[in-house]
Amino acid sequence: MKKDIHPNYVECTVACACGNTFKTRSNKPEIKVDVCSKCHPFFTGSEKIVDSAGRVEKFNKKYGRK
């Protein structure tokens, strides 16, 4: 294998929009996510609706659907 061509593999802090944080390893020092295992409906068992309206509106705007 060639030396000095791979990115640095460091400890990473993952921050969720709900406020939960946890550590893992990655080539980035910080990652921000919208949902995690503490707030995702599959893991919590609640019927929380994950906001996807923004993505749908963006798609419709981009491709001209009304």
Swiss-Prot record:
Binds 1 zinc ion per subunit. GO terms for cellular component: ribonucleoprotein complex; ribosome. The keyword DNA repair does not apply. Gene3D superfamilies: Ribosomal protein L31. Transmembrane segments: none annotated. One of its GO terms (biological process) is translation. Pfam families: Ribosomal_L31. Keywords: Metal-binding, Ribonucleoprotein, Ribosomal protein, RNA-binding, rRNA-binding, Zinc. InterPro entries: Ribosomal_bL28/bL31-like_sf, Ribosomal_bL31, Ribosomal_bL31_A, Ribosomal_bL31_sf. Zn(2+) binds at residues 16, 18, 36, 39. One of its GO terms (molecular function) is structural constituent of ribosome. SUPFAM superfamilies: L28p-like. Its cofactor is Zn(2+). Belongs to the bacterial ribosomal protein bL31 family. Type A subfamily. Part of the 50S ribosomal subunit. Binds the 23S rRNA. HAMAP family: Ribosomal_bL31_1 (MF_00501). This is Large ribosomal subunit protein bL31.
